[in-house]
Amino acid sequence: RLKDAGLQSVPGAGAEILTDSVKEIISPKKIDSDDWIRIMKESFELGLPASATMMYGHVETNNDIVEHYDKIAKLQKDLNGFMAFIPWSFEPNNTLMQKEGIVTVGAGGMQLLKMIAISRIIFDGLIDHIQSSWLTNGVGMAQLAIQYGSDDFGGTLIGEEVVSCTGSRSTELTDKRIIDSIKQIDYSAEERDNFYERVSMR
């Protein structure tokens, strides 16, 4: 019904880490891994593409990260519905997990760069676009992420209400700030639409 009403794609949020032992700790009220994958499959079969996300930097292990990558890769090989992959770090400030001492500090910039580089290698030939995650790591780290394998700076946001609650940084960027940040590292800025089709060179 939503597609008939004009829906053209779906978000890939809510994946967190696709390991249920982790999801039970960090997001017990959200759907489990199988349900997330089922929803993505049904969306792809209806012709609705999505992004795939991974939230790292909390209680996950390296094995959990590998399992997450593996599930995303297998689903993409089967149905080819993911337009982009977005790894982003958990920001613990003002969260219950921080108050309970489960997560005390964020993952940091080096971990972001590792995740970007690993994502580019794992999804080579599978998922074309890797997003820089400026929202959780800042503009400077997004510039580095582009040089480590990201090709999507990420968009301007209006009314973001999750990361902004952590008080870590501004959650809005103008298009000029994004363009300037890309040009500062000697890359060309290109505006795209939701489906990664070129709108204009900037």
Question: Where are each of the predicted segments found?
Answer:
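Structural detector of well-ordered beta-strand residues that form the stable sheet scaffold
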Residues: 10-11, 51, 86, 131
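Conserved non-cysteine loop/helix-boundary elements of the Radical SAM core domain that shape
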Residues: 1-48, 55-78, 97-107, 168-169
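Auxiliary Fe-S-binding modules of radical SAM enzymes
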Residues: 70, 76-202
